[in-house]
């Protein structure tokens, strides 16, 4: 088994050492989360205008708000699925 050294001028080494263009992950503050959750209770889907309003009020980008809502809908879907499974297994166990 032959292992070659990665030369510093190869595309592979450039890829390995390249810095990601993404921003550092920054968790939401309690205030931001509370405001986003409150809005989610009223609307699971936002219009662009509403998303821009919310993003300004909680000091986030509209993209961050959009992604937060996408993730929150997926979380709700997952929780709903888990509850249905739990109910089915409970019914099978006790019937």
UniProtKB/Swiss-Prot annotation:
CDD domains: homeodomain
UniProt keyword Zinc-finger, yes or no: no
SMART domains per UniProt: HOX
Pfam family, one: Homeodomain
PROSITE patterns: HOMEOBOX_1, HOMEOBOX_2
Record keywords, A-Z: Developmental protein, DNA-binding, Homeobox, Nucleus, Transcription, Transcription regulation
DNA-binding region listed in the record: 21-80
Signal peptide coordinates: none
Domain of life: Eukaryota
Subcellular location: Nucleus
GO molecular function, one term: DNA-binding transcription factor activity, RNA polymerase II-specific
UniProt xrefs under InterPro entries: HD (IPR001356), HD_metazoa (IPR020479), Homeobox_CS (IPR017970), Homeodomain-like_sf (IPR009057), HXA10/ABDB-like (IPR046333)
A GO cellular-component term linked to this record: nucleus
The keyword Transcription regulation is annotated on this UniProt entry: yes
Protein family: Belongs to the Abd-B homeobox family.
Function: Sequence-specific transcription factor which is part of a developmental regulatory system that provides cells with specific positional identities on the anterior-posterior axis.
Protein name: Homeobox protein Hox-D10
Source species: Gallus gallus
Underlying gene: HOXD10
């Amino acid at each position: 088994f032959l292992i070659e050294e990665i030369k510093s001028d190869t595309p592979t080494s450039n890829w390995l050492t390249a810095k990601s263009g993404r921003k550092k992950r920054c968790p939401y503050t309690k205030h931001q989360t509370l405001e986003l959750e409150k809005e989610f209770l009223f609307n699971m889907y936002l219009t662009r205008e509403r998303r821009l309003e919310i993003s300004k009020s909680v000091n986030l980008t509209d993209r961050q708000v959009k992604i937060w809502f996408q993730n929150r809908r997926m979380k709700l879907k997952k929780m709903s699925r888990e509850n249905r499974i739990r109910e089915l297994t409970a019914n099978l166990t006790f019937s």
